[in-house]
Amino acid sequence: MQHFKVVDNQAYIGGTHNTRPVMMAFSFFDHTTKVLPGLYANHIEISSIEVDPARREVHVLVHTQKRGCQFSVRSYSYDAKPLRTLDFGGEDHNLISGKLLTVNDDELMLIGNYSTDCTPYSQGIYVTRIAHGETGPADADRIQYVEFSALQNFFKYLKPKQQQKMQAKLDKLKQENRDTKFRYRLLVHDPILTEEGLLLVAEVYYPQYRGTAMPNAVNLPRVGPAAVDRYFDTFRYTHAIVCGFDRQGNLLWDNCLPIQDLDSAELTEMVQVSQQDDKLVMAYPHKGEIKTEVIQKNRTVRETETFSLKVGTNDKQKITDSENENLLAWYGHYFLACGFQKIVDDPRQGFNPREVFYVNKLTYSLTEKPTDDKAGRSGK
């Protein structure tokens, strides 16, 4: 299961079966299940599902890897009947992912990342407005594209000298009228409605693979000096970008959160954002700690800070390992942190760690300087 949404008494569940996408509607009332038609096919990926409680509609955003890498918004009724399809296709830009956000009674905004070569590697982000009930081929002229190189703070995750070299490279390419496109994998979050328009957060990542050199064995063919078996290891996150748009889809500002040595076995949203007045608190879990940074549009108000997750009520207890760490921006200035920890009650009495599952309620208030005392405590 990869997608889950609820409207009234019905849940919409999306996943894959035999490498093909499947979307089902499950009724909590009579416990019946219906399959949404038109999705179980080869070369189709479900980008996201969005629900419209007011109209009792479900929008399934899909990406087709063939036929010009078409992207479409397929709308269904509450009882899983197809209503309409809005297609996005183009020779120069291929939409990879998309998120919908209702801006008023008549319009939605579609935002996500795009590529220029029909691959998972994106060259930037896009935003467009669509009308409720719009169908058929979408108007490509309404889509606004923003290349990564056009973002002022996209490369802020690099060290100062590396940033200078990157900027010099960009300036040289522009002077020579050469291509300034960059290719990154992007995990796009749900957009957030603001007074100005909308807020988009996305995390830049890449998959890591490990290679195992297998020595020659008896009766096995020799291919080169050794056979190498590459297998997936983890996803490595490098930085997160945050962009502010007005209600017409124009980029107003951008910022960047550097991410330090963060790996995850599953591709999930690690960076969480809490809105506090006109500032944003950006945070992510990292090896039993929480790292934060506070921004105000394109300015950094507080540099990276690190807070420890305390263990129980015994100060002698020590965390020896943390796994499956998750952080959630809850409400107001509160976060929730959970995961598994291995702790030692008193290292002086021997090393005998025990594993606990913890749920912490964390507070980050901009009205005062945060301290480690605000970190929550682990629950058993």
Model regions and ranges:
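Conserved blade-ending motifs and adjacent loop-strand segments that build the rim/top face
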Residues: 86-98, 142-161, 174-182, 255-272, ...
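Blade-level signature of beta-propeller repeat domains, shared across WD40, Kelch, NHL, RCC1
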Residues: 328-377
